[in-house]
Regions:
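Bacterial Sec-dependent N-terminal signal peptides
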Residues: 1, 5-38, 124, 130-151, ...
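Surface-exposed or flexible loop/turn and strand-edge residues in extracellular/cell-surface modules
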Residues: 11, 38, 52-54, 122, ...
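Tryptophan-anchored aromatic micro-motifs
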Residues: 25-49, 139-197, 217-219
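Generic short beta-strand segments
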Residues: 38-43, 69-71, 95-106, 155-164, ...
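N-terminal glycine/threonine-rich, aromatic-flanked beta-hairpin/loop signature
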Residues: 50-81, 166-290
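A short, structured loop/turn motif at beta-sheet edges
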Residues: 60-62, 85-92, 128, 272-273, ...
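Central antiparallel beta-sheet cores of small beta-barrel/beta-sandwich binding domains
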Residues: 64-105
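Beta-sheet ligand-binding and adhesion/scaffold domains
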Residues: 95-148, 262, 277-279, 286-420
């Protein structure tokens, strides 16, 4: 019995020593805001360094919370419970995760709640008594919000002839129907816009990837500013014949000298799918760091110019605010390795209706340019190109579009992709 008592006493002593070693004096852990700008907070999100933002740990005897402010793209503030452990004298390690039901936004001021979980955030790191912290954070689109879209999608480049011998599908496709006397115009526009739009996008865009961590990357071609004024409206039938290959199919290929640029996986844009919509959310803060100075103030200035032209800002402004909240929104259809991202008449109506009042004013501006002998050669070339496009689309002047849209029954503009 004495021997058993001694063994029990020793086990109890070892257990107490272990408990004491595991205990953390939470009062020693810095609780102040630690900023990335100061250099005392070294933070990465999906391995991309964060230059602006802060981290803060709040701890008590029961729990600890990590706050990340302006760190996770699309979110002003993210809080998560963390486990704290001693990592040596004056140093503690931590890890935690949280699920976000709020949708990311282009401007974090507009972030809104949504259900169900959209993003899952994980973090780990260390903090020292000297007020220095490292945070390694990762994001993941929830399984539900991935909706089977994760992966690389290539632009549709090959299409078989349809029943009318036209392509059965286009890389960029416009489907348009209208009532009465405008029916034929809408049908012709469907073909012309699909063809011209597809030829343009085929030479500018190659693929996009929806990554599991929420990043959107793409292969694209930089816009070439040279030769913009040399536009000549091609003949539709000539173009269609040129697209038919030896296999009898239509091929929308990029130009022979096209060099694709890869948009890096650098938290520049994020994505998720929810309730039948695919959202692509540009990270304006990251774009600004990479030299793009576009901001909300620039947008408001542009709205002022549009108002002067006659655009109905009362209709347009809510649409812009919606975009700031949710990013770029598309309906989508995914089936058998094909993905269609599209906007229909319901989605386009508010934006188009906002611009309709400006078209008569645009008539006057173009007429004044045409009668002005002092405009530059570049302006003359641009005016000629615009007139050629309008003529090909069946318009004498911009305001001819107004009654067409007012009599439109259905409208759909799509980007067609295939799984890589």
């Amino acid at each position: 019995m004495p021997l058993c008592a001694l063994v029990c006493a020793l086990e109890f002593s070892v257990s107490c020593d272990k408990d004491n070693a595991d205990k953390i004096d939470w009062k020693e852990i810095p609780s102040e805001i630690i900023t990335a700008e100061s250099g005392n907070a070294v933070i990465t999100v999906n391995e991309v360094p964060v230059k602006i933002g802060y981290a803060k740990i709040s701890a008590n005897s029961d729990n600890a919370t990590l706050t990340l402010n302006n760190v996770i793209p699309g979110y002003r503030k993210v809080e998560m419970g963390i486990d704290l452990k001693s990592a040596g004298e004056g140093e503690w390690s931590f890890s935690g995760q949280t699920s976000l039901t709020a949708s990311p936004s282009m401007v974090t001021l507009f972030s809104v709640e949504a259900r169900p979980t959209i993003y899952e955030i994980s973090s780990e790191g260390k903090i020292t008594s000297e007020g220095k912290i490292t945070v390694v954070a990762t994001t993941k689109v929830s399984e539900g919000a991935q909706a089977g879209l994760t992966g690389t999608w290539n632009l549709l480049r090959t299409a078989a002839p349809g029943a009318n011998l036209l392509p059965s599908a286009y890389p960029m496709q416009v489907t348009w129907t209208a009532d009465g006397e405008y029916a034929a115009t809408a049908e012709n526009l469907s073909v012309a816009l699909s063809l011209m739009g597809s030829l343009d996008i085929a030479d500018r865009f190659n693929s996009m990837t929806f990554h599991e961590d929420g990043n959107v990357t793409a292969e694209y071609k930089e816009e070439d500013s040279e030769g913009k004024g040399d536009f000549q409206m091609p003949d539709v039938q000539t173009l269609l014949k040129a697209l038919i290959g030896p296999d009898g199919k239509y091929h929308f290929n990029a130009g022979p000298n096209t060099e694709w640029i890869s948009l890096p996986k650098a938290n520049l844009a994020f994505w998720y799918a929810l309730q039948g919509y695919c959202y692509i959310v540009p990270n304006l803060a990251a774009s600004a760091e990479n030299g793009d100075d576009t901001n909300v103030l620039d947008i408001m200035k542009s709205l002022g110019s549009l108002k002067d032209l006659g655009v109905d800002i009362s209709i347009l402004l809510p649409q812009i605010q919606e975009m700031m909240k949710y990013g770029l929104r598309f309906k989508y259809s995914e089936e058998d390795g094909s993905l269609e991202l599209y906007a229909d008449k319901e989605m386009c109506d508010p934006v188009v209706n906002a611009f309709l009042p400006a078209l008569p004013n645009l008539d006057k501006i173009l007429a004044e340019m045409e009668s002005n002998p002092d405009i530059s050669a570049e302006e003359k070339a641009e005016l000629l190109a615009l007139k050629q496009v309008m003529k090909a689309l069946g318009f004498e002047k911009p305001s001819d579009f107004v009654p067409l849209w007012q009599n439109t029954l259905t409208f759909r503009i799509s980007i067609n992709l295939v799984k890589a």
